[in-house]
Amino acid sequence: MKGVNMEKQQPSKAALLSIIPGLGQIYNKQKAKGFIFLGVTIVFVLYFLALATPELSNLITLGDKPGRDNSLFMLIRGAFHLIFVIVYVLFYFSNIKDAHTIAKRINNGIPVPRTLKDMIKGIYENGFPYLLIIPSYVAMTFAIIFPVIVTLMIAFTNYDFQHLPPNKLLDWVGLTNFTNIWSLSTFRSAFGSVLSWTIIWALAASTLQIVIGIFTAIIANQPFIKGKRIFGVIFLLPWAVPAFITILTFSNMFNDSVGAINTQVLPILAKFLPFLDGALIPWKTDPTWTKIALIMMQGWLGFPYIYVLTLGILQSIPNDLYEAAYIDGANAWQKFRNITFPMILAVAAPTLISQYTFNFNNFSIMYLFNGGGPGSVGGGAGSTDILISWIYRLTTGTSPQYSMAAAVTLIISIIVISISMIAFKKLHAFDMEDV
């Protein structure tokens, strides 16, 4: 890398010249970088005029002739080209910042790459890790960000069973879908019912599986327990069997009339609990009992993962801490509260939080166990539907409401992201320095 002469550069002038990308770099005597930036801009301008402009125009209008114009395809293609425009805008402002920063570095006597060879060498030495993650960012852009943008756009259209392209055109309707959730009594009632059950479900089911997982791990880690490997295998069985098989099996077991729970388990329990004698619990025909069954099932399905995670953490806690606590006269509860649980929380907090976010969107158990039933709460939602399964109903019913489903999807995303970020911040989930 070549040194830099002491000629002073003007950072503001370099930034101003970079209004045309590349000129600021050329001013800083980085001609190779400048011509590359200028070339990227020329290619983008040609692409924008030839390809992006027509598609972005179609994105705004969503077509004007039914049958010929497919509004949905126009929206998707427009979103695709919009990503490239956004990427270039980020590049454009980065180019201005780069010119300003390099000019300041030159004035401070810091060497900067001038030739193409120096640039390649600098990238290899300092930027090689970033080159390796570029494919991941590209994949993430089109596998995650692109669908999110399309969903966001659909939420602001009237895409439903009455407006199905290409026979009908879509129109931009602004916030109508979001306001309809609150203004239309059917959707307002359904949304309130589904949201409240979703929150109860996520909190109850996740907490249950975490408590069972931590409890079984602590018991299995006790020195007086014999046959730990056998217990380990038994505790892992719910994890080893595919979840959909377990859910379908439980669905049969909880059948009101012929299920094993009512016909075999309850008669055995009735010997110890007389009030259960002759009882037939309506597991799949009463919404309350269905919800209880769902929570118990998720506790069974989810605890093995927490068990394995917690057991690994417990085995890594130094015995010196427990010995010191014993000398200080601490009992078992004090050891757990002041040593065990803080260590588990410090290491596993991100994973524990993810259990709540996962169950908030746990579609499979709702769909496979009882199809969101029994009964309905209006708006196309079943009595045990959570938000994600309600979205499924909105998009696959006889009168699909795609735009409304997209609006609910965005609401889910906002709720989950907000709660997760608050939880991560409050628990200092990624602050591992003190562990």
Swiss-Prot record:
<feature type="transmembrane region" description="Helical">
    <location>
        <begin position="404"/>
        <end position="424"/>
    </location>
</feature>
<feature type="transmembrane region" description="Helical">
    <location>
        <begin position="263"/>
        <end position="283"/>
    </location>
</feature>
<feature type="transmembrane region" description="Helical">
    <location>
        <begin position="230"/>
        <end position="250"/>
    </location>
</feature>
<dbReference type="GO" id="GO:0042956">
    <property type="term" value="P:maltodextrin transmembrane transport"/>
</dbReference>
<protein>
    <recommendedName>
        <fullName>Maltodextrin transport system permease protein MalC</fullName>
    </recommendedName>
</protein>
<comment type="similarity">
    <text>Belongs to the binding-protein-dependent transport system permease family. MalFG subfamily.</text>
</comment>
<comment type="function">
    <text>Part of the binding-protein-dependent transport system for maltodextrin; probably responsible for the translocation of the substrate across the membrane.</text>
</comment>
<keyword id="KW-1133">Transmembrane helix</keyword>
<feature type="domain" description="ABC transmembrane type-1">
    <location>
        <begin position="195"/>
        <end position="423"/>
    </location>
</feature>
<keyword id="KW-0812">Transmembrane</keyword>
<keyword id="KW-1003">Cell membrane</keyword>
<keyword id="KW-0762">Sugar transport</keyword>
<dbReference type="GO" id="GO:1990060">
    <property type="term" value="C:maltose transport complex"/>
</dbReference>
<dbReference type="InterPro" id="IPR035906">
    <property type="entry name" value="MetI-like_sf"/>
</dbReference>
<keyword id="KW-0813">Transport</keyword>
<dbReference type="Pfam" id="PF00528">
    <property type="entry name" value="BPD_transp_1"/>
</dbReference>
<feature type="transmembrane region" description="Helical">
    <location>
        <begin position="338"/>
        <end position="358"/>
    </location>
</feature>
<feature type="transmembrane region" description="Helical">
    <location>
        <begin position="199"/>
        <end position="219"/>
    </location>
</feature>
<feature type="transmembrane region" description="Helical">
    <location>
        <begin position="371"/>
        <end position="391"/>
    </location>
</feature>
<feature type="transmembrane region" description="Helical">
    <location>
        <begin position="130"/>
        <end position="150"/>
    </location>
</feature>
<dbReference type="InterPro" id="IPR000515">
    <property type="entry name" value="MetI-like"/>
</dbReference>
<feature type="transmembrane region" description="Helical">
    <location>
        <begin position="34"/>
        <end position="54"/>
    </location>
</feature>
<keyword id="KW-0472">Membrane</keyword>
<feature type="transmembrane region" description="Helical">
    <location>
        <begin position="294"/>
        <end position="314"/>
    </location>
</feature>
<dbReference type="GO" id="GO:0015423">
    <property type="term" value="F:ABC-type maltose transporter activity"/>
</dbReference>
<feature type="transmembrane region" description="Helical">
    <location>
        <begin position="73"/>
        <end position="93"/>
    </location>
</feature>
